[in-house]
Structures are given as structure tokens and as C-alpha cells.
Amino acid sequence: MKVILYSTGCPICLKLKELLKSKNIFYDEITDIDIMLNKGFDSVPILEIDGKPLDYKQATQWIKERNGN
């Protein structure tokens, strides 16, 4: 499974990053705004799971479901 976090370092991005780390979910982080815009992302954080983008709410739900919490 490929997990990518698109982040600008905003407070919500940092919260999601900490949640991922606390659950030992490995991910790559992309901070290049041009890449985000080219993918059509107009807000962050976005967590991409195997090519499927999730907004913050969806991402936190995915993390909780994946880890049984």
C-alpha cells in the first residue's frame, strides 16, 4: 500500500502527521505546492492511499478504521 501525505506544514497537517506516526503508518510526504496544484488539490492536508485522495476528515477515519480504533 502506498501512502502519501500532501502537506504545507500547517497545524492540521501536523496533527495528521502525528496521528500517522502514532499508529506506525509509514508514508511519503510531499510539500511541493506545484505538485499539489497539478493534482487538483486546493487544500491540505490530503492523504493519498494507493492513488485515492482523502481530505482530513476522511484520512482520520481511514487511520482509525485501519487500526481498529
Positions of PLM-derived features:
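Local sequence-structure signature of Cys/Sec-based thiol-disulfide redox active-site neighborhoods
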Residues: 1-26
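A short beta-strand-loop structural module common to alpha/beta enzyme folds
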Residues: 26-34
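Structural micro-motif
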Residues: 39-47
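Non-catalytic, surface beta->alpha helical segment in thiol-disulfide oxidoreductase systems
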Residues: 48-69
